[in-house]
């Protein structure tokens, strides 16, 4: 959430930033609403001040045996007391209206973020590795998985409907191996602390990360009002909600390997076959909590940690800097990692790493105490996928496919595969 004080002082900057994101100007309406709210606050404060002063004057009048004045003052105090509830209610309503409006405004992009409309305007930052060179024809992951006999969409649909998958045997083990490899890498070598956290959260947690109120249609909601997490970013980031941290203890780096749940409400007709876009999928999430000065460097570090997963798997990928029109709601700058999928003859997103500034921290009231002046400031938050397990499975299947239809296990996963070096067709 943006600071209304900053908006009051920089209305043109807000509208310019919104224009970069393809959004309409909002500063004038926000400033006008804030003026009404501040006026209501001042009115309530004036009434309280006058009531308190009149109450003291009653005592003075009585001590001077001026009963007539005391009675007049008592009448005034009663009138002021009667007026206060309406003024305070106006203040509450205007504050709620302003906060709701602020909660729906996206974050301000950094100056170095490329301006653009959509994914076609994203910029290639770097490319790692090369496309595999084969004599055989590439295949899509669902063709490979079904031919092996370990990937079943028909049974998944019978169980749960569309956008679900059943994996069995060595493919189920490969999925588990990928997740275990990622969490081991990030905790043992990248300095992240593993967290096991709930898969259901309250609305307040989703508000904190910016998923609510704007993106409720993307979420699964339980009958008791809780939500299934769309990503472990929600739980990991909210670990510091309503806390004041010591600057000396920053950065905090958290990671979790969890299922994620998404309704894919805006994805009708997209990636309907296979595992690319599922309602339920495993993901290894990375979250960093930093001070303001360290956030940009931490963003580069986090992205490098996610890239390391793909490098060790021997996968060809590129890192994209997202343009203003393609960035997430809470992001100030985002790198997407796109892995090469031979079966699609295309790069597809496998990780997204974002720096959010104090945007989420304001929503969570998460702060740190400065080590020099001891003043309290909002933390800066970052999040990234390290990486999406299902999409990594897809990439391994398509990039390690052999001519006979078998799939070679990448070397880095061999310790997790119980002696299996290749996945072959089920007998």
Swiss-Prot record:
Chain residues that bind L-serine: 231-233, 285, 385
CDD domains registered for this protein in UniProt: SerRS_core
Keywords in alphabetical order: Aminoacyl-tRNA synthetase, ATP-binding, Cytoplasm, Ligase, Nucleotide-binding, Protein biosynthesis
UniProt enzyme class: ligase
GO biological process, one term: seryl-tRNA aminoacylation
UniProt key word Nucleotide-binding: yes
Superkingdom of the source species: Bacteria
Catalytically driven reaction(s): tRNA(Ser) + L-serine + ATP = L-seryl-tRNA(Ser) + AMP + diphosphate + H(+); tRNA(Sec) + L-serine + ATP = L-seryl-tRNA(Sec) + AMP + diphosphate + H(+)
Pathway annotation: Aminoacyl-tRNA biosynthesis; selenocysteinyl-tRNA(Sec) biosynthesis; L-seryl-tRNA(Sec) from L-serine and tRNA(Sec): step 1/1
Record bears the keyword Ion transport: no
The EC number(s) this enzyme carries: 6.1.1.11
GO cellular component terms, A-Z: cytoplasm
One MF term in the entry's GO annotations: serine-tRNA ligase activity
Subunit structure: Homodimer. The tRNA molecule binds across the dimer.
Free-text comment about domains: Consists of two distinct domains, a catalytic core and a N-terminal extension that is involved in tRNA binding.
NCBIfam families registered for this protein in UniProt: serS
Function: Catalyzes the attachment of serine to tRNA(Ser). Is also able to aminoacylate tRNA(Sec) with serine, to form the misacylated tRNA L-seryl-tRNA(Sec), which will be further converted into selenocysteinyl-tRNA(Sec).
Protein name per its UniProtKB record: Serine--tRNA ligase
Species annotation: Rhizobium leguminosarum bv. trifolii (strain WSM2304)
Gene name linked to the record: serS
């Amino acid at each position: 959430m943006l600071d209304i004080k900053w908006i009051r002082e920089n209305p043109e900057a807000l509208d310019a930033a919104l224009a970069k994101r393809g959004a309409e100007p909002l500063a004038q309406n926000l400033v006008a609403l804030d003026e009404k709210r501040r006026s209501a606050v001042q009115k309530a404060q004036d009434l309280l001040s006058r009531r308190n002063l009149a109450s003291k004057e009653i005592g003075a009048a009585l001590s001077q045996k001026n009963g007539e004045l005391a009675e007049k003052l008592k009448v005034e105090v009663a009138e002021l007391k009667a007026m206060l509830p309406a003024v305070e209610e106006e203040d509450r309503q205007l504050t709620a209206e302003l906060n709701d409006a602020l909660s729906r405004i996206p974050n301000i992009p950094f100056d170095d973020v490329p301006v653009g409309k959509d994914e076609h305007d994203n910029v290639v930052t770097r490319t790692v590795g090369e496309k595999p060179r084969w004599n055989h024809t590439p295949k899509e992951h669902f063709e490979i998985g079904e031919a092996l006999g370990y990937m079943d969409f028909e049974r998944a649909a019978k169980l749960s409907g569309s956008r679900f998958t059943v994996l069995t045997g060595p493919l189920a083990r490969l999925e588990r191996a990928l997740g275990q490899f990622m969490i081991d890498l990030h905790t043992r070598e990248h300095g992240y602390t593993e967290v096991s956290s709930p898969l259901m959260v309250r609305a307040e947690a989703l508000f904190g990360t910016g998923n609510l109120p704007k993106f409720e249609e993307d979420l699964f909601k339980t009958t008791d009002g809780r939500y299934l997490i769309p990503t472990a970013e929600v739980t990991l980031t909210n670990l510091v909600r309503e806390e004041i941290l010591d600057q000396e203890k920053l950065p905090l780096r958290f990671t979790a390997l969890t299922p994620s749940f998404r309704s894919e409400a805006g994805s009708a007709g997209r990636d309907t076959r296979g595992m690319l876009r599922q309602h339920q999928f495993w993901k290894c999430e990375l979250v960093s909590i930093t001070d303001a000065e360290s956030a940009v460097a931490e963003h580069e570090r986090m992205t490098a940690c996610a890239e390391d997963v793909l490098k060790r798997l021997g996968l060809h990928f590129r890192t994209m800097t997202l343009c203003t029109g393609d960035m997430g709601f809470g992001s100030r700058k985002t790198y997407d990692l796109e892995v090469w999928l031979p079966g699609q003859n295309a790069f597809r997103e496998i990780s997204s790493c974002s720096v959010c500034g104090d945007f989420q921290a304001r929503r969570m009231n998460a702060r740190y105490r400065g080590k020099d002046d001891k003043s309290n400031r909002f933390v800066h938050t970052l999040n990234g996928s390290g990486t999406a397990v299902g999409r990594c499975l897809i990439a391994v299947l398509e990039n390690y496919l052999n001519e006979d239809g078998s799939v070679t296990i990448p070397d880095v996963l061999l310790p997790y595969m119980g002696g299996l070096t290749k996945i072959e067709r089920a007998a």
